[in-house]
Amino acid sequence: MVAIAEPQAAVAVTDGSVEATLDYYLETGEKPYTYTGGPGSLDVRTGGGKDPRQVLLHSGRQEAGDFTLDRNGFRFVRHDTKVGDFFDEAQIRSVYYPEMEALVKAQSGASRVVVFDHTLRTADDAAREARKIREVVRRVHNDYTEWSGPQRLRDILPGEAEALLQRRFAIVQV
């Protein structure tokens, strides 16, 4: 099956909750894939089974202080950035990277933080085409697996990776 992903409109319910359709992967025997024509391209195709499900999403903002990295794998943190334009690659690297390094170190207690990349995405077709930005991902997914997480560490820090893999490490997305 090949389909162009269409955005699903969310419907407000109450107290910051919304009903939305989330597309999950459905096992069909076909290997799932996503093809994009690259940054700025409007050509996006996906394959593999699609299992759309209507779900109720609750805002976590009211309980923001209850979430912890150790228990939930995420937490809500307020951060005021000095970045004025998130489409400016130079600002992101020179201002936001150091901000995120300090933020993750302070929030996680990590002894070392390495900011290794970022991805700009937008659902606005005109902005995506004009600024050569990638499209949003329209499937429920995880970015790293048991195999790809350690492999990413090897790719980023090849000379240190094997020693670092003997200790605890985390890939934190901000």
Regions flagged by a language model, labelled:
Residues 4-173:
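Non-heme Fe(II) oxygenase catalytic core, chiefly the N-lobe of the double-stranded beta-helix
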